[in-house]
């Protein structure tokens, strides 16, 4: 592309949602980006608001990470390729950009990369802007029939896929999912696909328990501090084979997860507590001989996620309860912060 044409394209305006500080989002004008070698320009289609986005918006940090300000949030997204022979192709976008060279990448764990860049985190701008450039290697073309909204939710589905792989759910197992937000509901769907015979789900919000049943939970319980006792009673004192904690509520769900697990069980912690700390009874975990694993984002999940949705084995559409345009960003973030519905989507 000629330098002058590049200059003209870069001068074309776009809207970009900049996060400056707690409760301070501003929709501003910006220049469209120009792709570097190995990258391609994308026109953003749909962006899901994640729990970590809300932690940033309400508290200024998440998972012990603070941001460089201003920053564009948004890491659950789909987009249309905006240049080249594939212009107009809808793609899912992996927000994680590992280095590919470090010890952990070489071991097959790019989610643990020491040099990882992640959309909408640290100093890497995310997708809440009309255009962005991204490495071609992180794009996954979506088949006909896929909606942009579904494409955006392949990222949280990937988190659920990774978590259930860590848990190693087998047919006939009894599983618990503590926290029935989007990640919890997708974990329920994945546990059901893996053949779990009984799935207990908990949440503090009654409406989310209804969604848990719709997504495959056989038993739903309010997260009132007594759920562990009820689960033990329902399983004749045996407890759960595999437990997934997806609430991120600073300890209560983690403690209940530990107390609900059978001897020798695996407990997978997915949720991110707002205070970056959690507690549970060490003696309860030790007496049970539990294996406790932390789920760090996801790895190698996009092809599987696309296949599962394409085959109708995973339902993403039912999780989308609110949709907004970019100009109504304030309402979108406030709705998500109030935990109304399940998944809030911003369509660009």
List each model region and its residues.
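Glycine-rich cofactor phosphate-binding loops and adjacent beta1-alpha1 units
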Residues: 167, 210, 215-291
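Cytochrome P450 core scaffold surrounding the K-helix E-X-X-R motif
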Residues: 52-58
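NAD(P)H dinucleotide-binding glycine-rich loop of Rossmann-like/cofactor-binding domains
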Residues: 99-178
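Residues in the short beta-alpha loop(s) of Rossmann-like NAD(P)-binding domains
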Residues: 205, 273, 298
């Amino acid at each position: 592309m000629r330098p002058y044409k590049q200059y003209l394209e870069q001068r074309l305006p776009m809207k970009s949602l900049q996060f400056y500080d707690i409760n301070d989002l501003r929709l501003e004008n910006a220049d469209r980006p120009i792709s570097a070698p190995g990258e391609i320009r994308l026109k953003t289609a749909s962006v899901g608001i994640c729990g970590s986005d809300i932690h940033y918006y309400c508290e200024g940090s998440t998972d012990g990470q603070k941001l460089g300000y201003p920053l564009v949030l948004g890491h659950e997204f789909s987009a249309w390729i905006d240049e080249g022979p594939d212009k107009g192709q809808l793609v899912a976008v992996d927000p994680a950009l590992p280095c590919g060279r470090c010890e952990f990448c070489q071991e097959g764990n790019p989610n643990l990369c020491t040099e990882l860049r992640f959309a909408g985190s640290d100093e890497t701008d995310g997708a809440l802007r009309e255009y962005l450039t991204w490495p071609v290697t992180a794009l996954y073309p979506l088949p006909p029939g896929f909606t942009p909204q579904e494409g955006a939710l392949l990222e949280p589905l990937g988190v659920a896929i990774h978590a259930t792989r860590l848990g190693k759910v087998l047919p006939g197992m009894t599983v618990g999912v503590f926290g029935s937000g989007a990640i919890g509901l997708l974990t329920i769907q994945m546990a059901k696909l893996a053949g779990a015979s009984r799935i207990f789900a908990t949440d503090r919000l009654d409406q989310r328990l209804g969604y848990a049943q719709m997504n495959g939970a056989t038993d739903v319980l309010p997260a009132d501090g007594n759920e562990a006792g009820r689960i033990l009673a329902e399983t004749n004192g045996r407890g759960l084979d595999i437990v997934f904690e997806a609430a991120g509520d600073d300890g209560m769900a983690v403690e209940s997860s530990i107390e609900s697990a059978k001897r020798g069980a695996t407990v997978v912690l997915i949720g991110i507590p707002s205070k970056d700390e959690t507690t549970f009874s060490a003696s309860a975990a030790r007496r049970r001989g539990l294996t406790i694993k932390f789920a760090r984002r996801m790895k190698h999940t996009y092809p599987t996620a696309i296949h599962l949705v394409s085959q109708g084995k995973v339902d993403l559409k039912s999780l989308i309860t609110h949709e907004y345009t970019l100009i109504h960003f304030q309402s979108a973030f406030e709705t998500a912060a109030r935990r109304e519905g399940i998944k809030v989507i911003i369509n660009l």
